[in-house]
């Protein structure tokens, strides 16, 4: 069966490099499933989970918290260039919980002072923290 090579790259280096038979990511237009021999494509990614179903007898599924970036699909090679990315097994849940609480406090404070830019920034931080928490539970 044809498989794809999947790489997730961040400014800190390669976070993931495996073969897969199916990938699921979220773009601004919604969830996108990717199978081998997919058309060539470049698309932006949302802060969301990435599901990678590997081939083989065990049908292993890997989960990665993707915090924005782009996906490029070309000739059965899928490359994700992300601002940051963490595999489910690598997520520090207590740190993510603290980031969630901090973002919630910042949202409340920014809304009180009507600081729109600060509200937006804190909401992005909250989405990232919630994404990491959700992926850690997979």
UniProtKB/Swiss-Prot annotation:
Keywords: ATP synthesis, Cell membrane, CF(1), Hydrogen ion transport, Ion transport, Membrane, Transport. It is found in: Cell membrane. Its main location: membrane. It comes from the Bacteria. The keyword Transmembrane does not apply. InterPro entries: ATP_synth_F1_dsu/esu, ATP_synth_F1_dsu/esu_N, ATP_synth_F1_esu_C, ATPsynth_dsu/esu_N. It is a peripheral membrane protein. One of its GO terms (cellular component) is proton-transporting ATP synthase complex. Gene3D superfamilies: ATP synthase delta/epsilon subunit, C-terminal domain, F0F1 ATP synthase delta/epsilon subunit, N-terminal. GO terms for molecular function: ATP binding; proton-transporting ATP synthase activity, rotational mechanism. Signal peptide: none annotated. CDD domains: F1-ATPase_delta. Belongs to the ATPase epsilon chain family. Produces ATP from ADP in the presence of a proton gradient across the membrane. PANTHER family: ATP SYNTHASE DELTA/EPSILON CHAIN, ATP SYNTHASE EPSILON CHAIN, CHLOROPLASTIC. F-type ATPases have 2 components, CF(1) - the catalytic core - and CF(0) - the membrane proton channel. CF(1) has five subunits: alpha(3), beta(3), gamma(1), delta(1), epsilon(1). CF(0) has three main subunits: a, b and c. This is ATP synthase epsilon chain. It comes from Streptococcus pyogenes serotype M5 (strain Manfredo).
């Amino acid at each position: 069966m044809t498989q794809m090579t999947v790489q997730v790259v961040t400014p800190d280096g390669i976070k993931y490099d495996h073969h897969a038979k199916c990938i699921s990511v979220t773009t601004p237009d919604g969830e996108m499933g990717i199978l081998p021999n997919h058309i060539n494509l470049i698309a932006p990614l949302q802060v969301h989970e990435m599901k990678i179903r590997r081939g083989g007898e065990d049908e292993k599924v890997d989960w990665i918290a993707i915090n924005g970036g782009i996906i490029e699909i070309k000739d059965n090679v899928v490359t994700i260039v992300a601002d940051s990315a963490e595999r489910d097994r690598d997520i520090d849940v207590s740190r993510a919980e603290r980031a969630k609480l901090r973002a919630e406090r910042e949202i409340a404070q920014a809304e009180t002072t009507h600081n729109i830019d600060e509200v937006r920034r804190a909401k992005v931080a909250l989405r990232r923290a919630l994404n990491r928490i959700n992926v850690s539970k997979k």
